[in-house]
């Protein structure tokens, strides 16, 4: 997840927290087409649908880490705005999910209200594939930086999709062509913030964002504070079965989404959710739901 600057500001990850050991793959090895790394990545897609990519060892990976840190800076600036200002950019669910979702607008698995601010930035708006919309001032001021993040994140995900092409018997580039940057899609950069819980609140049992699977082809997630949990495939949706994903400096989490599962059948039905921790601000810069654009 981003560079060490943000990890240095975060509380230590609790030693007694139940975690899940996801595999970590070298982005440099995937770029070079290392067959062993590719085979293990394909196996992780089938078993978990989640894995970590170490971006340290690649020039392109380090560029993306820098971009992700810029998105974290934007996240802080954005969610420092007052509530009345943020509400001016509210999304229009379910018709249009672009824009701001205030904390407490959704119900979580336990019937309580969510504890997560969320802002979806539409890729087509940023890249000029459709008429520009008016976003919150910090987003408008950082359009060039968001565009860089989108392009570099897309290139990173393309390396993963080409690896999957190889193991699915497809021509290289087949899966990437379903999500071209120059055509309209529902791809988003999603910024999230879960404020600190009130003192004395039952934080471990508090669900910040309910369990779900992602709707697109792939998601690239950057996190610093360990609120993300995964429910392994086949286990009952009970609190004790969920496992935290420990954030790792310099790594990004990849999630295989529902669309790619439908097209390829490669993933077990693993869910994710976000749970709060005491005294922490959970900030995520999340690229893409990469959606089928309808391109031939």
Residue ranges and their predicted role:
Residues 1-296:
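Peripheral, non-catalytic segments flanking oxidoreductase cores
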């Amino acid at each position: 997840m981003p560079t060490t600057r943000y990890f240095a500001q975060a509380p230590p990850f609790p030693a007694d927290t139940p975690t899940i050991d996801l595999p970590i793959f070298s982005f440099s090895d995937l770029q070079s087409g290392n067959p062993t790394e590719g085979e293990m990545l394909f196996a992780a897609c089938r078993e978990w649908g989640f894995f970590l990519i170490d971006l340290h060892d690649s020039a392109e990976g380090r560029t993306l880490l820098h971009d992700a840190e810029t998105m974290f800076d934007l996240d802080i600036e954005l969610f420092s705005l007052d509530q009345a200002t943020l509400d001016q950019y509210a999304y229009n669910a379910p018709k249009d999910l672009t824009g701001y979702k205030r904390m407490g607008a959704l119900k979580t698995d336990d019937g309580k209200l969510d504890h997560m601010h969320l802002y979806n930035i539409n890729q087509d708006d940023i890249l000029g594939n459709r008429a520009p919309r008016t976003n919150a001032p910090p987003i408008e001021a950082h359009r060039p930086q968001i565009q860089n993040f989108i392009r570099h994140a897309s290139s990173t995900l393309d390396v993963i999709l080409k690896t999957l092409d190889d193991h699915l018997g497809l021509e290289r580039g087949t899966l990437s062509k379903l999500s071209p940057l120059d055509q309209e899609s529902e791809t988003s950069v999603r910024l999230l913030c879960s404020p600190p819980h009130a003192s004395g609140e039952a934080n471990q049992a508090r669900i910040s964002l309910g369990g779900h699977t992602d709707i697109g082809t792939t998601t690239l997630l950057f996190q610093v504070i360990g609120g993300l949990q995964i429910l392994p495939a086949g286990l009952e949706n009970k609190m004790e079965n969920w496992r935290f994903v420990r954030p790792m400096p310099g790594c990004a989490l990849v999630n295989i989404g529902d669309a790619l599962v439908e097209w390829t059948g490669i993933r077990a039905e693993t869910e994710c959710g976000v749970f709060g921790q005491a005294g922490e601000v959970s900030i995520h810069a999340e690229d893409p739901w990469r959606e089928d654009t309808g391109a031939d």
